[in-house]
Every structure is written in C-alpha cells, then in structure tokens.
Amino acid sequence: DKPKYQAEVISTLEVKKDGDSFAISDDSLKAFLSQALYDCMEPYNAVCEILDIQNFLQSYLDASFKGEVTQFAKHTSRTEEEALAWYETETFDPPSELGEAYVQRYKDALKNIMKQCQYSTGIPKKDAGGFNYTMDVTVVPNNSLIDAMNEFQQGTYYSIDEVSAGLVATLEKYAAAPTYGEETTVNVPVNFNSLISAGEDNADLTNLSLLILPT
C-alpha cells in the first residue's frame, strides 16, 4: 500500500534573535506542534477518552456503594468532602420509627452491606453521535439487603424497641455474612441522558444500582 497524505498545512513560526542564537516563542511552538501532531495524537486521545469513561462509571459505582470518593470527586469537580457528603445524603437515613439507640448501628450495618457489593466495568464501546457509549458491567447481585428484610418481616415483635433491635440485628447478620445471586453481565448506556437521569425511576443507572443491590 502507498502512504496516504492529507492536505498541506503551512505553519508560521515566530523566531527571535537572542544574542548569538535564535529562539522560538512558546506560543508559536505550541501552535506548530498542535498542527503537526494532531493526527498523530488523535488515536491516543480516543483511547484515553474511552478509558476515562470506564473510570468514571467505576468511580461512580465505588462512590455510591463504598464511599470511595477520590476518583469520583476528580470526575465531577467536587472536593472529596463534597463527594462524601453526596454519598452520605439520604442513603443511610434510618426509618423514622427506629429507636435512637439503634441509629448508628443501623447506618454502620447498611454501609458494610453496600461496601461488599461486587461489580466490574468493561471497556466502553463508542456509538454514533457525540458523547455516546455502551459498556458491559459484570455484577454479582448482593442480595443481603432484600434477604435481611425478608427475614426480619417473618419475626414477631411486641414493642418499638423489639422492632428496632430485630431490624438492626438482622442487618448486622447479613453485613457479617452477605448473600449473593448469580453473576450476570448487562450492557449499560453512558451518555448525557443516562447521566442526567441517574437516580430516577427506571433510569439506566438506577436499574444498574438495583441489580447490584436489590431492595
């Protein structure tokens, strides 16, 4: 095969005499390199973009389920403190009837269940139309929460304190020994619509979260 060439591009470099030598201004050199290396770097840029999308979804899941917010903060221009506050908001609010003495144990048990969720993100595939990708996500459903609630509801309780103690003890049991379903792989779209609708009923990322941790 013969080499293929694109249209000729003429660049103008600003060269100034500096004593006995000549120097090219930084701005002029940057402009030249951006023209000369654009096509050379484009394949690398495309790969970096794909890996960045994969890292974003992985960091979103890690922040949502495990409170690991460092990478998620970088992707969302939040501070780590702001990302951690996002993780804490509402997720661990106990039932209003729960006795005050059990609130912290409830939160700790729920966090421990969520931290043991199992998932991994695959390499994204670029689809037509700008920022538009699909990605395989492999999930081992963490059935601990739904199993804990089913077990708790089978008990008999005679006071609010017994209800609180029973709920927390059951959650702690499954936090110590999680239960899992069968491994499955789902194809998840990652685009502006899926990101904007995250958290809404039947949204793609909401459905993914419910697959990871059924409720």
Which role fits each region the language model picked out?
Residues 1, 36-112, 119:
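Core segments of small alpha/beta cavity-forming domains
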Residues 33-35, 40-43, 71, 75, ...:
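Generic local-structure boundary detector
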Residues 72, 127-134, 187-196:
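Solvent-exposed, well-ordered amphipathic alpha-helical segments
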Residues 122-123, 174-178:
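Beta-strand-rich interaction surfaces with strong enrichment in secreted/lumenal proteins
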